Amino acid sequence: MKKIILALVALTCISSDISSQTRTKKGGSAKSQKSTSTVRRTVHPGDPPPGPRVFSPAIVAGELVFTSGQIGIDPKTSQMVEGGFEAQAEQVLRNLAAVLEAAGSDISQVLKTTVFLADMDDYNKMNEIYRRHFKEDPPARSTIQVARLPRDARIEIEAIALVKRLNL
């Protein structure tokens, strides 16, 4: 009986050591959860905002990074950029690049994007801007028109990419 209790205590101690806090090289933060088969960590470019969050900018799981949808918010002001669709689309792609960088990846490693447009009439403009950022071997992509986006954004993009280096 004592051996069983000791074994259970040992397993409890081992399992409680699975999560740990780490910082990325670029000053972003990451929270890791280690297991025998994969590593999962949250990614925030720069310091994470204070208070509770309902989503993370990105999650790294193994060798993949999954980003949340990025909209045209200027990270310095937390305001939507001015200048219409084109300005928002450029900011979205800059924000996406920053999140990928914090995760140890970059635009060249993107495998798949999902683009959400508030108005499908912006599709051709989006393609022109998108092409400037994904020059060679563009990723697989889906584009969907939606009724409304957060903060009345006109475009949102999420991505799945390979991690080039592990920032643990």
What are these regions (language model features)?
Residues 7-15:
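Bacterial N-terminal signal peptides
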